[in-house]
């Protein structure tokens, strides 16, 4: 009986660690892509667009921290969606929730430079598919909850 309790406890702890590691790695994956895409590849487009509006592009450390929180929340949503969906289904829902809705809002506010979308759309799709893959790979030993 003691052995089975330890075994169950160890399995539970292993599962929790697997989930947390999946979330951490996928969050880092998304954060790296966001930084490279927006702060390196498309930085001039963002800066020019904001300058044309008479604004400075928000690039203070606190802005980066908020984007880190956004990435974490997106990955947590992916984690729960992945329990019931396959790779492409989960990625499609997560991409719409995380990116399409964001672009609609910031586009409506006039702060989205539309010229970035030909690069941002496919890149963000790869980004989300990669995050879903990471989450599913690390969760592969954890049974999914089918309805």
Question: What do the PLM-derived regions correspond to, one by one?
Answer:
Residues 5, 12-147:
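Juxtamembrane/disordered regions of integral membrane proteins
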